[in-house]
């Protein structure tokens, strides 16, 4: 298979193999998204890892990535060209009106 990685499943839990495999896929997706996001968010990633279910974590990370992409593509709130280049100060300068505009943007495109 081309570039697909094959993992060897060594399931020592009482969970079915398909569940363990799905959890591994979710965690891999989470790690991939985390690498795309700014480094100043690492503390939040650690919080998510220990306090929410993996699927919830994936949903949160996907939403954060979507918001960061919005900041770059649709606003002048950051000079970053890549999500990982967004600065903490860019987030500090976001105002309530900016969030309301984002929410309106989401309503139009969901």
Question: What is the role of each PLM region?
Answer:
Residues 41-55, 64-110:
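N-terminal core-binding DNA-recognition domain of tyrosine recombinases/integrases
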Residues 1-52, 58:
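N-terminal DNA-binding module of tyrosine recombinases/phage integrases
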């Amino acid at each position: 298979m081309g570039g697909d990685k094959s993992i060897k499943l060594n399931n020592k839990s009482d969970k079915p193999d398909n569940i363990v495999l799905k959890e591994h896929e979710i965690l891999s997706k989470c790690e991939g998204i985390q690498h795309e996001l700014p480094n100043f968010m690492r503390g939040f990633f650690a919080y998510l890892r220990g306090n929410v279910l993996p699927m919830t974590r994936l949903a949160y990370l996907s939403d954060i990535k979507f918001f960061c992409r919005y900041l770059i593509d649709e606003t002048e709130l950051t000079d970053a060209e890549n999500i990982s280049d967004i600065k903490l100060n860019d987030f500090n300068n976001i105002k309530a009106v900016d969030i309301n505009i984002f929410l309106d943007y989401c309503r139009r495109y969901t």
